[in-house]
Amino acid sequence: MKSNLENLNFQTSIREQVVPSRKKVKLPAWLEVAKPRLIPLLLATTLGGMALTEEWPLSSPKLICTLGGGALAAAAAGALNCLWEMDLDKRMKRTSDRALPSGKLSFNTVFLGAVSCTLAAAMLLISGVNYLAAGLTLLGLCSYVILYTIILKPRTTQNIVFGGVAGAIPPLVGASAATGHVGLSGWWLFSLVMLWTPAHFWALAILLKDDYASVGIPMLPSVKGSEFTVKAISRYGWATVFMSILGVFALPEGGILYLIMLLPFNGRLLQLINRLKSSPDDLEKAKGLFRWSILYMFGICLLLLISRTQLSVDFEHQSMQMFLSLKAYFNY
């Protein structure tokens, strides 16, 4: 009995370190429902989509309108998600103190806020960017709320595999904001995020599998167990690494430096996945993989931005000249 209690306390401690309780990290109620922790990474991948185009860097007004519209749409999606899952959140100890279940905000207040953010996002993107960027942003919002939250999440263990399309749309928004169309490079980053999402999310789901099981949400670890889930994480992790390497062909220039800087990111990702494979129920290892996966995607987007600097272009030219010189020397 004592051993079980200690294990439960340990699991709770790990969860609190990864997904802090709202009691420990206080946010204003109106900000909490917008899920602001999710927005920075969405904006980072939007910037990544922009950096893959010939038009990078964008003018300041267009950049601000794109990121501002994306942030507003993401806030609206988060609020609508909270509205739909309000009854579910009441039943989980981890989420029962959120703004809606606890009564800090009313349903009507949050709904009006979500509608206002959606309209503001659409107006900002249409007036300051273009119709395609606005349409893709609203598609991302709808896919998160309708496809993932309402349709897939309560019905299938593959909810995040297909529902991950919502988180993969920002690169398309970034590319379309820059050029007026998406292009193959934008689709590459879209594909990378799609492959990265299951490995990222399932690492978190291992930590929260008991919470999901208690309310009947069929997350993969809750239904199939940690060992099965980690095998799936490994497959998606390797697919992510392979797709990330293809980024060298997606970049207009600076691909050589990108490829070199990418190596430690991929190495660390695979290392953490292998550690979790050796102990699928080790929550500390799941926590480590989850946290690194966030840094990994931020890192990829940063590498894309660095690769478009003059320093990277000069490095690529010098590398090519060195290669040609060595080739000529050995041929001689």
Curated annotation (Swiss-Prot):
GO terms for biological process: heme O biosynthetic process. One of its GO terms (molecular function) is protoheme IX farnesyltransferase activity. Its EC number is 2.5.1.141. GO terms for cellular component: plasma membrane. Pathway: Porphyrin-containing compound metabolism; heme O biosynthesis; heme O from protoheme: step 1/1. The chain crosses the membrane at residues 63-83, 109-129, 132-152, 160-180, 188-208, 245-265, 286-306. It is a multi-pass membrane protein. Pfam families: UbiA. Keywords: Cell inner membrane, Cell membrane, Heme biosynthesis, Membrane, Transferase, Transmembrane, Transmembrane helix. The keyword Cell membrane applies. Belongs to the UbiA prenyltransferase family. Protoheme IX farnesyltransferase subfamily. Carbon 2 of the heme B porphyrin ring is defined according to the Fischer nomenclature. HAMAP family: CyoE_CtaB. This is Protoheme IX farnesyltransferase. It comes from Prochlorococcus marinus subsp. pastoris (strain CCMP1986 / NIES-2087 / MED4). The lineage of its organism: Bacteria, Bacillati, Cyanobacteriota, Cyanophyceae, Synechococcales. The gene is ctaB.
